[in-house]
Regions:
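Acidic, Ala/Val/Gly-enriched low-complexity intrinsically disordered segments
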Residues: 6-8, 16
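Structured, non-catalytic alpha/beta "coupling" segments that mediate domain-domain communication
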Residues: 192-203
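Alpha-helical protein-protein interaction scaffolds
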Residues: 181-187
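Acidic, Ser/Thr-rich low-complexity linear motifs
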Residues: 107-112, 157-174
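N-terminal alpha-helical interaction modules that lie
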Residues: 20-155, 201-202
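Cationic, low-complexity basic patches in intrinsically disordered or flexible, solvent-exposed regions
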Residues: 3
Length: 203
């Protein structure tokens, strides 16, 4: 991770002899109008659903210095790494191919760099599933928590370094809890009370 700039190495001029000219289109990138009327509330998960310029629904999470915007499905940042829905899908496909060719998992490994990229991707899905939980869109919570649990399984089994095999395990109980709460909430909303209780007991 790149270190933040040192303020001591910065310079500020009280009078710039050649001040930059303002350009109209620069103002269009200012997110102040987007944040107006939507104050950040410390200790609260502030989220909302909006319609993007592409006509599709998107999630926004308010932060102290701005916001996060996420796609409702697929990878939250809207990218398709290596042509796949996510990095997890890409490495799972590589594992399947390795098994097909070799008939075994032996020899398949994830490097520290690959594990780091997977962890960064997992954070994106974390932001989305807690946003969806606040909005009571529980099916998306089930989907994303189950997906991150698959990621934990992949890293714990195939990471080259012990650190990468263990570092995410601290989050497994929380992921399971959120998955159970979401499944139980779906059943409860559908008045399937026995199924809601069953989901809790299974968790």
């Amino acid at each position: 991770m790149q270190s933040p700039p040192d303020p001591a190495n910065s310079s500020m001029h009280s009078q710039d002899p050649h001040p930059p000219r303002r350009q109209g289109r620069m103002n269009s990138k200012d997110i102040t109008p987007v944040l107006k009327g939507w104050d950040y509330e410390p200790g609260t998960i502030n989220v909302r659903k909006i319609t993007g310029t592409d006509g599709r629904p998107k999630l926004q999470m308010r932060l102290d210095l701005g916001l996060l915007q996420m796609e409702m499905s697929g990878r939250p940042d809207g990218t398709t790494p290596h042509g796949c829905e996510s990095l997890l899908d890409y490495y799972e496909a590589r594992l399947d191919e390795h098994r097909r060719i070799n008939g075994t998992d032996l020899g398949f490994h994830l490097t520290p760099e690959q594990c780091q990229s997977l962890r960064e991707e997992a954070v994106m899905y974390y932001h989305r599933y807690i946003s969806l939980f606040v909005l009571e869109e529980y099916s998306g919570v089930v989907r994303d928590t189950a997906r991150n649990l698959r990621l934990l399984d992949l890293c714990s089994q195939f990471a080259e370094e012990e650190h990468d095999r263990l570092v995410l395990e601290q989050y497994r109980p929380y992921l399971i809890m959120m998955n159970v709460r979401a499944r139980a909430s779906i059943a409860y909303k559908n008045k399937q009370y026995a199924k809601a209780l069953e989901a809790i007991q299974e968790g």
